[in-house]
Protein backbone atom coordinates (compact mmCIF):
# COMPACT_ATOMS: atom_id res chain seq x y z
CA UNK A 1 0.00 0.00 0.00
CA UNK A 2 2.79 2.41 0.93
CA UNK A 3 4.75 1.48 -2.20
CA UNK A 4 1.70 2.08 -4.42
CA UNK A 5 1.05 5.45 -2.82
CA UNK A 6 4.71 6.42 -3.19
CA UNK A 7 4.67 5.47 -6.87
CA UNK A 8 1.54 7.55 -7.39
CA UNK A 9 3.16 10.59 -5.77
CA UNK A 10 6.27 10.19 -7.91
CA UNK A 11 4.13 9.93 -11.06
CA UNK A 12 2.18 13.05 -10.08
CA UNK A 13 5.40 15.02 -9.49
CA UNK A 14 6.83 13.94 -12.84
CA UNK A 15 3.62 14.78 -14.67
CA UNK A 16 3.50 18.21 -13.06
CA UNK A 17 7.12 18.89 -13.94
CA UNK A 18 6.46 17.91 -17.53
CA UNK A 19 3.41 20.17 -17.70
CA UNK A 20 5.34 23.16 -16.42
CA UNK A 21 8.25 22.64 -18.78
CA UNK A 22 6.15 21.85 -21.86
CA UNK A 23 6.44 24.64 -24.47
CA UNK A 24 2.91 23.99 -25.74
CA UNK A 25 1.15 23.93 -22.37
CA UNK A 26 1.05 27.67 -21.75
CA UNK A 27 0.99 30.71 -24.01
CA UNK A 28 4.58 31.71 -24.66
CA UNK A 29 6.41 33.91 -27.18
CA UNK A 30 9.44 31.63 -27.49
CA UNK A 31 8.19 29.88 -30.63
CA UNK A 32 7.30 33.06 -32.54
CA UNK A 33 9.28 33.79 -35.67
CA UNK A 34 11.04 37.15 -35.80
CA UNK A 35 9.40 39.96 -37.82
CA UNK A 36 6.13 38.07 -38.16
CA UNK A 37 2.82 39.03 -36.61
CA UNK A 38 1.87 42.22 -34.79
CA UNK A 39 0.90 43.28 -31.31
CA UNK A 40 -2.52 44.79 -30.65
CA UNK A 41 -0.84 48.16 -30.21
CA UNK A 42 0.68 47.88 -33.67
CA UNK A 43 -2.59 46.69 -35.19
CA UNK A 44 -4.52 49.62 -33.77
CA UNK A 45 -1.88 52.29 -34.39
CA UNK A 46 -3.31 55.37 -36.07
CA UNK A 47 -1.52 58.29 -37.69
CA UNK A 48 -2.55 61.93 -37.19
CA UNK A 49 -4.02 62.37 -40.67
CA UNK A 50 -6.91 64.70 -41.49
CA UNK A 51 -9.12 62.23 -43.33
CA UNK A 52 -12.08 63.62 -45.25
CA UNK A 53 -14.73 61.94 -47.37
CA UNK A 54 -16.03 63.16 -50.72
CA UNK A 55 -19.38 63.67 -49.02
CA UNK A 56 -17.71 66.00 -46.54
CA UNK A 57 -16.10 67.94 -49.39
CA UNK A 58 -19.55 68.35 -50.91
CA UNK A 59 -21.00 69.50 -47.59
CA UNK A 60 -18.23 72.08 -47.15
CA UNK A 61 -19.14 73.60 -50.53
CA UNK A 62 -22.89 73.52 -50.00
CA UNK A 63 -24.52 76.87 -50.72
CA UNK A 64 -21.34 78.36 -52.18
CA UNK A 65 -21.02 79.82 -55.66
CA UNK A 66 -19.16 77.81 -58.31
CA UNK A 67 -15.39 77.77 -57.87
CA UNK A 68 -12.39 76.81 -59.98
CA UNK A 69 -10.90 73.45 -59.08
CA UNK A 70 -7.81 71.75 -60.42
CA UNK A 71 -6.82 68.12 -60.80
CA UNK A 72 -3.52 66.42 -61.26
CA UNK A 73 -3.95 63.48 -63.63
CA UNK A 74 -1.52 60.60 -63.10
CA UNK A 75 -2.42 58.57 -59.97
CA UNK A 76 -5.02 61.22 -59.06
CA UNK A 77 -7.67 60.74 -61.75
CA UNK A 78 -6.08 57.97 -63.77
CA UNK A 79 -4.18 54.87 -62.75
CA UNK A 80 -1.76 55.41 -65.61
CA UNK A 81 0.98 53.01 -64.54
CA UNK A 82 0.24 50.65 -67.48
CA UNK A 83 1.27 53.40 -69.92
CA UNK A 84 4.32 54.36 -67.87
CA UNK A 85 5.35 50.72 -67.42
CA UNK A 86 5.20 50.17 -71.17
CA UNK A 87 7.14 53.38 -71.77
CA UNK A 88 9.89 52.26 -69.43
CA UNK A 89 10.20 48.90 -71.19
CA UNK A 90 10.32 50.62 -74.57
CA UNK A 91 12.72 53.48 -73.85
CA UNK A 92 14.83 52.56 -70.80
CA UNK A 93 14.18 49.10 -69.31
CA UNK A 94 16.97 49.36 -66.75
CA UNK A 95 16.42 52.90 -65.51
CA UNK A 96 13.99 55.81 -65.24
CA UNK A 97 15.77 57.71 -68.00
CA UNK A 98 12.59 57.45 -70.08
CA UNK A 99 11.07 60.18 -67.89
CA UNK A 100 13.60 62.63 -69.37
CA UNK A 101 13.05 61.45 -72.92
CA UNK A 102 10.72 63.69 -74.94
CA UNK A 103 9.94 60.77 -77.25
CA UNK A 104 8.27 59.01 -74.33
CA UNK A 105 6.16 62.05 -73.46
CA UNK A 106 5.18 62.45 -77.11
CA UNK A 107 4.06 58.83 -77.23
CA UNK A 108 2.21 58.65 -73.92
CA UNK A 109 0.13 61.79 -74.44
CA UNK A 110 -0.57 61.67 -78.18
CA UNK A 111 -0.56 58.02 -79.28
CA UNK A 112 -3.50 56.59 -77.41
CA UNK A 113 -1.51 55.04 -74.59
CA UNK A 114 -3.80 56.54 -71.96
CA UNK A 115 -6.64 54.41 -73.27
CA UNK A 116 -4.92 51.70 -71.23
CA UNK A 117 -5.03 53.84 -68.10
CA UNK A 118 -7.80 53.08 -65.62
CA UNK A 119 -10.02 55.90 -64.32
CA UNK A 120 -10.19 55.84 -60.53
CA UNK A 121 -13.58 55.53 -58.83
CA UNK A 122 -12.66 58.32 -56.42
CA UNK A 123 -11.78 60.53 -59.38
CA UNK A 124 -15.14 59.88 -60.97
CA UNK A 125 -16.93 60.73 -57.74
CA UNK A 126 -14.99 63.99 -57.32
CA UNK A 127 -15.56 64.92 -60.95
CA UNK A 128 -19.28 64.28 -60.67
CA UNK A 129 -19.45 66.44 -57.54
CA UNK A 130 -17.77 69.44 -59.13
CA UNK A 131 -19.51 69.17 -62.49
CA UNK A 132 -22.91 69.05 -60.78
CA UNK A 133 -22.01 72.17 -58.83
CA UNK A 134 -21.10 73.96 -62.03
CA UNK A 135 -17.50 74.42 -60.92
CA UNK A 136 -14.81 75.25 -63.48
CA UNK A 137 -12.59 72.17 -63.76
CA UNK A 138 -8.97 72.36 -64.91
CA UNK A 139 -6.50 69.54 -65.48
CA UNK A 140 -2.91 70.50 -64.66
CA UNK A 141 -0.38 67.75 -65.24
CA UNK A 142 3.34 67.60 -64.68
CA UNK A 143 3.77 65.97 -68.08
CA UNK A 144 5.59 67.99 -70.75
CA UNK A 145 3.54 69.01 -73.79
CA UNK A 146 4.03 66.72 -76.81
CA UNK A 147 6.55 68.31 -79.15
CA UNK A 148 4.12 68.33 -82.08
CA UNK A 149 1.54 70.22 -80.01
CA UNK A 150 -1.05 67.48 -80.46
CA UNK A 151 -2.44 65.48 -77.54
CA UNK A 152 -5.27 63.01 -76.98
CA UNK A 153 -5.29 63.07 -73.17
CA UNK A 154 -8.08 65.66 -73.07
CA UNK A 155 -10.36 63.41 -75.11
CA UNK A 156 -9.51 60.42 -72.92
CA UNK A 157 -10.50 62.35 -69.79
CA UNK A 158 -13.67 63.60 -71.46
CA UNK A 159 -14.71 60.04 -72.30
CA UNK A 160 -13.62 58.42 -69.04
CA UNK A 161 -15.26 61.01 -66.79
CA UNK A 162 -18.25 61.91 -68.98
CA UNK A 163 -17.45 65.61 -69.13
CA UNK A 164 -19.89 67.69 -71.22
CA UNK A 165 -18.38 69.76 -74.03
CA UNK A 166 -19.45 73.02 -72.39
CA UNK A 167 -17.57 72.11 -69.19
CA UNK A 168 -14.43 70.68 -70.78
CA UNK A 169 -11.11 72.49 -70.59
CA UNK A 170 -8.05 71.19 -72.40
CA UNK A 171 -5.30 69.59 -70.35
CA UNK A 172 -2.59 71.99 -69.23
CA UNK A 173 0.86 70.43 -69.67
CA UNK A 174 2.86 72.28 -67.03
CA UNK A 175 6.04 70.25 -67.45
CA UNK A 176 8.50 68.90 -64.92
CA UNK A 177 10.27 72.02 -63.68
CA UNK A 178 10.07 73.06 -60.02
CA UNK A 179 6.79 74.78 -59.06
CA UNK A 180 5.58 74.24 -62.63
CA UNK A 181 1.90 74.13 -61.69
CA UNK A 182 1.86 77.26 -59.53
CA UNK A 183 1.51 79.79 -62.34
CA UNK A 184 -1.44 77.93 -63.86
CA UNK A 185 -3.21 77.61 -60.52
CA UNK A 186 -2.86 81.35 -60.08
CA UNK A 187 -3.84 82.11 -63.68
CA UNK A 188 -7.10 80.19 -63.40
CA UNK A 189 -7.80 81.20 -59.79
CA UNK A 190 -7.84 77.64 -58.50
CA UNK A 191 -9.48 77.33 -55.08
CA UNK A 192 -9.01 73.58 -54.54
CA UNK A 193 -6.38 71.39 -56.16
CA UNK A 194 -6.44 67.59 -55.92
CA UNK A 195 -3.20 65.67 -56.24
CA UNK A 196 -1.32 62.60 -55.05
CA UNK A 197 2.20 64.02 -54.77
CA UNK A 198 3.91 66.26 -52.24
CA UNK A 199 4.58 68.77 -55.02
CA UNK A 200 0.85 69.01 -55.73
CA UNK A 201 0.12 70.01 -52.15
CA UNK A 202 3.03 72.42 -51.92
CA UNK A 203 2.31 74.03 -55.31
CA UNK A 204 -1.31 74.56 -54.32
CA UNK A 205 -0.29 76.35 -51.15
CA UNK A 206 2.20 78.52 -53.01
CA UNK A 207 -0.61 79.48 -55.38
CA UNK A 208 -2.97 80.35 -52.52
CA UNK A 209 -5.18 77.30 -53.10
CA UNK A 210 -6.08 74.42 -50.82
CA UNK A 211 -4.28 71.23 -51.73
CA UNK A 212 -6.27 68.08 -50.98
CA UNK A 213 -4.43 64.78 -51.13
CA UNK A 214 -5.67 61.85 -53.20
CA UNK A 215 -4.07 58.51 -52.32
CA UNK A 216 -1.64 57.08 -54.84
CA UNK A 217 -2.50 53.45 -55.72
CA UNK A 218 -0.27 50.91 -53.99
CA UNK A 219 0.68 49.27 -57.29
CA UNK A 220 1.66 52.54 -58.93
CA UNK A 221 5.00 52.51 -60.73
CA UNK A 222 5.64 56.00 -59.34
CA UNK A 223 7.97 55.31 -56.42
CA UNK A 224 8.80 56.12 -53.68
CA UNK A 225 5.33 56.51 -52.21
CA UNK A 226 4.53 59.89 -50.63
CA UNK A 227 3.68 60.31 -46.95
CA UNK A 228 0.03 61.26 -46.99
CA UNK A 229 -0.89 64.04 -44.59
CA UNK A 230 2.75 65.09 -44.19
CA UNK A 231 1.82 68.77 -44.50
CA UNK A 232 -1.35 68.59 -42.43
CA UNK A 233 -3.46 68.61 -45.60
CA UNK A 234 -6.82 66.92 -45.93
CA UNK A 235 -6.64 63.42 -47.39
CA UNK A 236 -9.54 61.83 -49.28
CA UNK A 237 -10.41 58.53 -47.62
CA UNK A 238 -10.47 55.41 -49.83
CA UNK A 239 -9.11 57.37 -52.79
CA UNK A 240 -6.41 54.86 -53.70
CA UNK A 241 -8.76 53.39 -56.30
From Swiss-Prot:
Enzyme class: hydrolase
Record-listed E.C. numbers: 3.1.3.2
Subcellular location: Periplasm
Catalytic residues in the record: 72 (nucleophile), 74 (proton donor)
Extent of the signal sequence: 1-27
Taxonomic superkingdom: Bacteria
Cofactor(s) needed for function: Mg(2+)
Family (UniProt): Belongs to the class B bacterial acid phosphatase family.
Protein name in UniProt: Class B acid phosphatase
Organism per entry: Edwardsiella ictaluri (strain 93-146)
Source organism phylogeny: Bacteria, Pseudomonadati, Pseudomonadota, Gammaproteobacteria, Enterobacterales
Amino acid sequence: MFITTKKSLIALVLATAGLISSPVSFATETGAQPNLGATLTQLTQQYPIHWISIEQVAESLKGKAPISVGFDIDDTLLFSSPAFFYGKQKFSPDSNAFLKNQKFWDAVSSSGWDRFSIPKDSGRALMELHLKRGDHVYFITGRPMPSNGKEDLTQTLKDDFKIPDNQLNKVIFAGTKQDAKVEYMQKYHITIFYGDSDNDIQDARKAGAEGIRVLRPLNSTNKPMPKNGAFGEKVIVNSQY
